Amino acid sequence: MSRYRGPRFKKIRRLGALPGLTRKTPKSGSNLKKKFHSGKKEQYRIRLQEKQKLRFHYGLTERQLLRYVHIAGKAKSSTGQVLLQLLEMRLDNILFRLGMASTIPEARQLVNHRHILVNGRIVDIPSFRCKPRDIITTKDNQRSKRLVQNSIASSDPGKLPKHLTIDTLQYKGLVKKILDRKWVGLKINELLVVEYYSRQT
């Protein structure tokens, strides 16, 4: 299944706020579809919905998300927590959380078009896994800086998670450490996502 490129508002009406996909939010009490079924069907629907929220927020294909679930499942820690850490430490998501891009698709474009450096080297792979002490910057030219300027100016410094810092004048971000669960930027029950995939095998 390919990455979703359709109407974004359609997805947030069904799944709720997906800040990585779009800055728009569904109206209070709008069409967040709540069809109640009995027993197993309702439980399956809830698990599927949580999985879809995770996939669309981070802009992943079904295959990519499944691969992350498998990697997380091999860790000694909680599978759900490791899954969120893997997704949050992707370069495209780090750019989004730093405020250098307004959405994850926008961050992905910055990376694909070679505007972003990690520790002084161009990285053009959005899924690149960042680690503590990594320094993320734009290329030292006006075009690259201009592309992130508006996003930084309109971002809310109060929403910057504690595992990141940013120098807005130099367009430079720092990954201080692996994030804690409470800093994840999406309202999600990751255990239901893990359960969804465990029941598919």
From Swiss-Prot:
Plastid is among the record's keywords: yes
Alphabetical list of InterPro entries matching this protein: Ribosomal_uS4 (IPR022801), Ribosomal_uS4_bac-type (IPR005709), Ribosomal_uS4_CS (IPR018079), Ribosomal_uS4_N (IPR001912), S4_RNA-bd (IPR002942), S4_RNA-bd_sf (IPR036986)
Record-linked SMART domains: Ribosomal_S4, S4
PROSITE patterns per UniProt: RIBOSOMAL_S4 (PS00632), S4 (PS50889)
GO MF term set: rRNA binding; structural constituent of ribosome
Disulfide bonds: none
CDD domains: S4 (cd00165)
Domain of life: Eukaryota
Database matches in Gene3D superfamilies: Ribosomal Protein S4 Delta 41, Chain A, domain 1, RNA-binding S4 domain
S4 RNA-binding domain segment(s): 89-150
Keywords: Chloroplast, Plastid, Ribonucleoprotein, Ribosomal protein, RNA-binding, rRNA-binding
Region feature Disordered, mapped onto this chain: 20-39
A cellular-component GO term for this protein: small ribosomal subunit
Main location: plastid
UniProt record, GO biological process: ribosomal small subunit biogenesis; translation
Localisation: Plastid, Chloroplast
Family per similarity comment: Belongs to the universal ribosomal protein uS4 family.
Subunit structure: Part of the 30S ribosomal subunit. Contacts protein S5. The interaction surface between S4 and S5 is involved in control of translational fidelity.
Function summary: One of the primary rRNA binding proteins, it binds directly to 16S rRNA where it nucleates assembly of the body of the 30S subunit. With S5 and S12 plays an important role in translational accuracy.
Protein name (database record): Small ribosomal subunit protein uS4c
Organism: Oryza sativa subsp. japonica
